[in-house]
């Protein structure tokens, strides 16, 4: 067992639920695959699950039981879950009864979905991965939780995440992605082993899981799909690392109400799944038919007709599409003013994979514009170079050292986290960011401070009123570099439908522009870290994908492009769980 505080409770619960559903507590791989005859939940998409449910081949109870059995078999390897919903089977029974009575709520009716554990659920604890919140039962559901349940989804589990969405600890001891004080490290199903390198042998995974959302359970078919959140790449990164399709939508597409915040200026939720079709279905369920009065940003984009993103699943969408290839930084290393150290670029294996991706685009009839230049990535004026304006993220970026980074994340954390705590009322275990920091220090021996709390510290230094002007100035500069001199310049200047970037490298600019980005799996590359693994360690290859980024509210077009690319490539490989 590699789990941290409280984690083993989830496994025990899974075993009990699996046993009460008619399965033994430890099933063989073959038994955990079978629901009815040769039907399997492994790698099975939402449309296929719905077809099976509609035909009566399976019931929602059988689906939940099969997923619980799979969790019971493999969770100890992955540590992907913080809490399993103890009422999942009861919910499945109710939805089966509705279906039998002729009521089908939508394409997620009776489908098990997991939520990142910073998304509030009143009936399942919401920990954010922090010890202080390990028993938190919020007094209200997140808007997206309500929408999913109204659509018939079964919330089967709450997933591991990087603690507080990766806003607990940066330098000098950065928190490892998908580590929480509540549950420990999560592992990547493509190689669920610990990193054996000296200096890294502390329990962390040998293949990074990405973060702060978790893709491990979704990749391993623990559920049909999951919902993550993203402030600066937290959907794109784990999707890339776990061979998933992930969408970080335009800010405002999906309500953030009831999601533990970092900053409302960049936070969003989004779907993560094994196929583009599944993310399209989940995207429609997550977006409200009307703006959420609890989130003013939800007026930005207009939902498609009937919130149906599957209408854009067009296998021929690449024909005639204009796709830009931004070589500088994303493909080829660049130097920035005042620093001779190269930044960005790809290794040989990644370069070959991206060459294959570009060739596929051309073969599908896309008009590939190669290269295109993003002005803020090559600007020689330091004040206009995006790479020189990172967000303040570690102890070195305290008030005395934050002149050359954007304070937006740390300012937003002070403003929005305290407001979120206030919304919890009597359920809140602490009432302010200051109290949380004090609580962590008082419980350091229990594991609350394994990586420190430098990001909480620099956030708590901010004064919401006194630092408002600085935050607004930094936001304006960020918008200029990521939009006007960034994505807008390249997309509009070349009349592009999208740009294509490797792996998760395009996540940062898309997130800071609040523009949509979608990842698509595209194969495996050697896992060759620096420093290297010890002699004799047989590292397995790691996932690597591509990402399409477009203008604000361009999700329908990006989904179409991603679907066409996925259909033409078919490069997703299931993790070797069996």
Per-region residue spans from a language model:
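Glycine-rich, small-residue loops and helix-cap segments
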Residues: 56, 110, 150, 199, ...
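Structural helix-boundary/capping segments
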Residues: 73, 220-334, 339, 343, ...
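Short helix-loop capping/hinge segments that flank enzyme active sites or metal/cofactor-binding pockets
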Residues: 109-131, 312, 317-339, 389-483, ...
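Loop/turn elements at helix/coil->beta-strand transitions in domains of secreted/extracellular proteins
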Residues: 59-61, 77-78, 104, 109-111, ...
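An N-terminal boundary/leader segment
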Residues: 2-3, 7-100, 330, 351-366, ...
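Acyltransferase
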Residues: 62-64, 93, 147-150, 308-314, ...
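Short, well-ordered beta-strand elements within core beta-sheets of diverse protein domains
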Residues: 48-55, 133-136, 267-274, 548-550
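Short glycine/serine-rich loop/turn segments
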Residues: 108-269, 294-300, 326-328, 332-333, ...
């Amino acid at each position: 067992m590699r789990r941290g505080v409280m984690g083993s409770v989830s496994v025990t619960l899974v075993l009990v639920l699996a046993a009460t559903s008619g399965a033994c507590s430890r099933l063989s791989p073959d038994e955990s695959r079978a629901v009815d005859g040769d039907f399997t939940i492994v790698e099975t998409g939402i449309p296929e699950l719905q077809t099976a449910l509609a035909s009566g081949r399976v019931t929602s109870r059988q689906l939940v039981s099969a997923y619980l059995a799979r969790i019971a078999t493999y969770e100890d390897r992955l540590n992907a879950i913080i809490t399993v919903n103890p009422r999942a089977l009861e919910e499945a029974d109710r939805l089966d009864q509705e279906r039998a009575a002729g009521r089908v709520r939508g394409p997620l009716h009776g489908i098990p979905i997991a939520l990142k554990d910073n998304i509030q659920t009143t009936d399942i604890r919401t920990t954010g991965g922090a010890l202080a919140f390990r028993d938190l039962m919020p007094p209200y559901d997140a808007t997206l939780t309500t929408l999913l349940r109204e659509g018939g989804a079964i919330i089967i589990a709450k997933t591991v995440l990087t603690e507080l969405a990766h806003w607990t600890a940066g330098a000098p001891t950065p928190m490892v992605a998908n580590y929480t004080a509540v549950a420990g490290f999560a592992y990547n199903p493509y190689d669920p082993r610990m990193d054996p390198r000296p200096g890294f042998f502390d329990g962390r995974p040998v293949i990074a899981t990405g973060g702060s959302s978790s893709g491990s359970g979704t990749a391993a078919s623990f559920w049909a799909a999951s919902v993550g959140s993203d402030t600066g790449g937290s959907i794109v990164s784990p999707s890339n690392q776990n061979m998933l399709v992930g969408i970080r939508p335009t800010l405002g597409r999906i309500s953030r109400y009831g999601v533990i915040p970092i900053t409302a200026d960049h936070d969003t939720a989004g779907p993560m799944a094994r196929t583009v079709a599944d993310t399209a279905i989940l995207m429609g369920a997550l977006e409200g038919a009307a703006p959420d009065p609890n989130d003013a940003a939800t007026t930005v984009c207009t939902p498609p007709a009937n919130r149906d993103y599957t209408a854009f699943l067009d296998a021929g969408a690449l024909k005639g599409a204009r796709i830009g290839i931004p070589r500088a930084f994303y493909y080829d290393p660049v130097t920035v003013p005042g620093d001779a150290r190269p930044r960005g670029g790809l290794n040989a294996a990644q370069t070959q994979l991206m060459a294959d991706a570009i060739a596929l685009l051309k073969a599908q009839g896309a008009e590939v514009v190669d290269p295109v230049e993003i002005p803020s990535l090559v600007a020689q004026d330091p004040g206009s170079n995006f790479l020189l304006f990172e967000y303040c993220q570690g102890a070195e970026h305290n008030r005395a050292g934050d002149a050359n980074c954007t304070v937006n994340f740390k300012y937003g954390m002070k403003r929005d986290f305290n407001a979120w705590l206030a919304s919890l009322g009597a359920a809140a275990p602490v009432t302010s960011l200051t109290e949380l920091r004090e609580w962590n220090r008082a419980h350091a021996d229990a594991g609350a401070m394994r990586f420190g709390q430098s990001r909480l510290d620099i956030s708590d230094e901010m004064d919401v009123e006194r630092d408002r002007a600085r935050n607004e100035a930094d936001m304006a500069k960020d918008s200029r570099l990521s939009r006007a001199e960034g994505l807008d310049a390249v997309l509009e200047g070349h009349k592009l439908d999208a740009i294509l970037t490797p792996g998760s490298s395009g996540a940062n600019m898309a997130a800071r522009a609040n523009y949509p980005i979608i990842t698509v799996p595209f194969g495996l590359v050697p896992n060759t870290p620096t420093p290297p693994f010890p002699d004799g360690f047989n590292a397995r290859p790691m996932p690597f994908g591509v990402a399409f980024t477009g203008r604000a509210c361009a999700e329908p077009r990006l989904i179409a492009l991603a679907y066409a690319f996925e259909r033409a490539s078919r490069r997703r490989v299931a993790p070797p769980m069996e």
